[in-house]
Design a protein with these regions (language model features):
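A short, GP-enriched loop/loop-strand-helix hinge that lies immediately N-terminal to
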Residues: 1-12, 27-33
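Conserved beta-strand edge residues that scaffold enzyme active sites
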Residues: 7, 34-35, 59, 174
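Conserved thiamine diphosphate
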Residues: 16-33, 142-143
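Residues within well-ordered alpha-helices
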Residues: 16-17, 41, 295, 310
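ATP-dependent carboxylate activation and anion-phosphoryl transfer catalytic cores
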Residues: 24-25, 48, 56, 61, ...
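Short acidic loop-to-helix transition motifs that present clustered carboxylates
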Residues: 34-40, 101-103
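Short acidic active-site motifs
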Residues: 40-41, 73
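Acidic/histidine-enriched active-site and ligand-binding environments that engage anionic O-linkages
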Residues: 43-53
């Protein structure tokens, strides 16, 4: 279940994928292909102009990424990022992108079948991150206007259709302060944050991933996707090791907690710290914010240190409630 293996290989090289998407009509962040050495990286960075982003070609989850402010920083950062990428992905190749600042991380959830049908299930705002790892997602983004949304969805569905891709996938963009969208990468899988899109649209994406793999065509089109209301997801992460003594999950309409936790679950330091995803939906963003605050207060995970209190502080922050946050949010706390 999932995309064709050839597509997975083709789309996994982020540097090469940018060229594919540029030819398909999307604006891509200026940058390089895969680099062969730190010396080549220095030449590319000088040409692009500092600051630049150094990224793993096969990367994901915030690994193998460095912000480089000057030539003096580059060589050591190159070796560190290459080693990190090799360890995490089995591929140490890197590429350089122009650093866009300030920016928001906006991604589009796509479904495409083998018959050429492509549908976008709206955007997610994933700008609340620490060390390039997402903490909270919401849909729709408070920063994207209806006119921008319509244009972005139209361009993205047309571009993905040209590639012949089939399956669930996510197109990731940076939105600059002028409101331009710059393509970064594509994830050829169902992402952690797909739940928030399911809550907004009512579409079971796991079911459709299975149906697409079985050769079933999409039975809905773009005109059937209604992006009304607001959904917010908080990632609940472990902050240390422990054994779960008690779990209390918040209830109520349009409240969802996806987790594998049960009493007695032991959390070790050897795996991803994600414990669960708390997701809420409401007809208005203001009400969704009130609902996620109440749900965070009600959620109890006893015996394991978590980031619940931190998530509560985030959703109570004026920059979040006003919708004016960007990728620097956690740096300025």
């Amino acid at each position: 279940i999932g995309p064709d293996p050839d597509d997975m290989e083709k789309f996994s090289d982020k540097a090469a994928l940018k060229e594919i998407m540029s030819k398909a009509g999307l604006a891509v962040i200026p940058g390089t292909g895969a680099l062969s050495s730190a010396g080549e990286a220095k030449e590319a960075a000088l040409q692009a102009g500092y600051p630049v982003m150094l990224k793993a070609s096969a990367g994901g989850g915030g690994r193998g990424i460095r912000l480089i402010g000057s030539e003096e920083e580059l060589e050591e950062a190159y070796m560190q990022a290459a080693g990190e990428a090799q360890s995490a992905f089995g591929d140490g190749s890197l590429y350089i992108e122009k650093y866009i600042y300030p920016a928001r991380h906006i991604e589009l959830q796509m479904l495409a079948d083998e018959y050429g049908n492509v549908v976008c299930l709206g955007e997610r705002d994933c700008s609340l991150q620490r060390r390039n790892q997402k903490l909270l997602e919401e849909t729709p983004s408070p920063a994207v206007s209806p006119v921008q949304r319509k244009a972005l969805i139209s361009a993205s569905t047309a571009a993905l259709k040209k590639t012949g891709y089939s399956g669930a996938g996510t197109l990731e963009f940076l939105m600059d302060k002028e409101g331009n969208f710059w393509f970064m990468e594509m994830n050829v899988r169902l992402q952690v944050e797909h739940c928030v899109t399911e809550m907004l649209t009512g579409i079971d994406m796991v079911k459709w991933q299975i149906r697409i793999a079985a050769g079933v065509p999409l039975d809905f089109g773009q005109e059937d996707i209604h992006l009304s209301g607001s959904a917010i997801e908080c990632r609940i992460n472990a902050r240390g090791c422990g054994e779960l003594q008690m779990l209390h999950v918040p209830g109520g309409p349009s409240v969802r907690f996806d987790t594998c936790l049960i009493d007695g679950t032991v959390v070790s330091p050897y795996y991803d710290p994600l414990l669960g995803k708390l997701v809420v939906y409401s007809g208005a963003r203001e009400e969704a914010i009130r609902k996620i605050r109440a749900s965070l207060c009600e959620l109890v995970i006893d015996g394991i240190p978590t980031n619940i209190e931190e998530q509560l502080r985030i959703v109570e922050d004026d920059r979040f409630t006003s919708g004016s946050y960007d990728l620097t949010f956690m740096d300025n706390r």
